[in-house]
A protein has these predicted regions:
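Small/polar (Gly/Ser/Thr/Ala-rich) solvent-exposed segments
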Residues: 42, 66-81, 101-107, 117-147, ...
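Amphipathic alpha-helical coiled-coil segments
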Residues: 43-58, 147, 151-170, 224, ...
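Bacterial Sec-pathway N-terminal export signals of envelope proteins
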Residues: 9, 17-78, 194-196, 229-274, ...
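Acidic, low-complexity, intrinsically disordered peripheral segments
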Residues: 20, 25-27, 62, 74-84, ...
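Flexible, solvent-exposed loop segments that connect beta-strands
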Residues: 80-103
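Sec-dependent N-terminal signal peptides
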Residues: 4-13
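Periplasmic alpha-helical coiled-coil/stalk elements that build and connect Gram-negative outer-membrane
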Residues: 25, 29, 144-259, 359, ...
């Protein structure tokens, strides 16, 4: 009995969480799904880990010691004629009459050396590399934000299209209820001889037309919902009920720069750091080395020729044909190009914001006008409904006014959706 109760309780809990997951289909759910399933965003996030690994590699190269094993075995073959007969020798140590390299200048040898090298002036280079790696990480994070931001806008716009279809479906359903109610009234009038059969037929035609619109809106909702799932990487083909969305206007924060200009700041820093990295070759380089091993020319008594040595290697570029000067000029020209791009981007962004605010003001005016028209249509339809009940107005007149009201209602639904799209655009640019 206890096992049965436990099984039943677990099923109830599972159904609760399943239903909760299916009902939590807000815009936030779709945006987060789109971010999680975007391969480009995942790639940008991996770049941060790649830069950290690269920084550790550079740290090892500039500051840590290095141990290397090197070796070579040199053969000097000759054709010897000593003793009156020719003989091929792979690695002659001595000969008088022979063909081949002069053995006094070149002879066989065997070298095997283990070398330990420690950079002594690598901290400056590592600091520059550390700054470059940090900047690359910041650039990867900024690219992630720059990819997420338009993705949020695309998901929001697609979500609003689905809500428009849903609103059209709901309104068409309400129109069907009105037509059914009037059909019931007119049918009684026809039965009592106060109305004509043609009036009832007109209402039947209007009902069929409205059902066709309802089917079209449901199909549009399914199509737009599948596009939304495709955009977000959601493997689901079932229709779900999306909650209503009212986008808030995100007003600008004073003295806070736009994140759109962040990429130009990072590009400018990247040029400066690249120039510093280039100038590292003009810094002096000093390395300490210690090696030990075997070096022999004559293999007889080779075991006595193990040894070791130590020293310093130094290098410093004094003159490079004015390459450094030309590199600095390139950096100045690149900085100028970045400033030009930044100013143009900021100009376009400000114009987009002003355009959105102007459109929002006009949409508010148009919505007030449409609301007044709808209120007038509702008054007329209310009066026509009373007169239709007693047969004082024709069904054709009633249907004509009803169609005008339906079209005005749809115009208002479209206007509200367009207004939400403008708010989404404003929030996108005001970032």
């Amino acid at each position: 009995m206890n096992r049965l109760l436990l099984f039943f309780s677990l099923n109830i809990i599972g159904l609760h969480f399943y239903g909760q997951g299916k009902n939590d289909l807000s815009i936030h759910y779709y945006i987060e799904a789109a971010k999680a399933n975007s391969p480009l965003i995942a790639d940008f996030r991996n770049q941060s880990e790649i830069e950290q690994a690269e920084l550790e590699r550079l740290k090892a190269m500039y500051t840590h010691s290095r141990l290397e094993l090197n070796g070579d075995y040199l053969f000097v073959p000759v054709v010897s004629k000593d003793g009156g007969h020719a003989e091929f020798k792979w690695n002659a140590r001595s000969a008088t009459d022979y063909y081949g390299y002069d053995l006094g200048e070149s002879s066989g040898s065997f070298h095997t050396v283990l070398t330990w090298t420690q950079p002594l002036l690598g901290k400056t280079s590592y600091k520059v590399a550390q700054g470059q790696a940090k900047l690359n990480t910041d650039m990867a994070r900024n690219r992630t934000r720059m990819e997420e931001h338009p993705l949020e806008r695309s998901v929001t716009e697609q979500y609003l299209l689905c809500l428009l279809d849903k609103a059209q479906i709901d309104y068409t359903d309400s129109v069907s209820a009105v037509i059914e109610r009037q059909t019931h009234i007119v049918r009684k009038l026809v039965e009592n001889g106060f109305s004509k059969q043609s009036d009832l037929n007109l209402l039947a035609i209007e009902r069929e037309a409205n059902m066709e619109l309802l089917t079209a809106f449901r199909q549009a909702y399914h199509t737009h919902l599948m596009d939304l799932n495709l955009l977000c990487g959601i493997a689901d083909t079932t229709d779900v009920d999306l909650p209503v969305l009212q986008l808030p206007i995100r007003w600008p924060v004073n003295d806070k720069p736009s994140l759109f200009t962040e990429q130009y700041r990072l590009d400018s820093l990247n040029i400066s750091l690249s120039l510093r990295s280039f100038n590292l070759q003009y810094k002096p380089k000093l390395d300490l080395f210690v090696n030990g091993g075997l070096q022999v020319g004559d293999f007889a008594g080779w075991y006595r020729h193990f040894g070791w040595s130590a020293g310093l290697t130094f290098s410093w570029t004094i003159f490079d044909g004015k390459q450094k000067r030309w590199k600095e000029r390139q950096a100045l020209w690149q900085q100028g190009s970045i400033r030009t791009y930044k100013e143009n981007s900021e100009y376009q962004r400000n114009m987009r914001i002003k355009q959105c605010l102007s459109e929002l003001h006009r949409y508010d005016q148009r919505e007030r006008t449409l609301e007044n028209q709808i209120a007038e249509y509702e008054t007329i339809l209310s009066d026509y409904g009373k007169e239709l009940n007693i047969g004082q107005v024709s069904v054709l007149d009633y249907i004509t006014v009803l169609r005008n009201k339906i079209q005005t209602e749809r115009d208002r639904l479209l206007l509200r959706t367009n207004r939400q799209l403008v708010i989404a655009a404003y929030n996108y640019w005001n970032w």
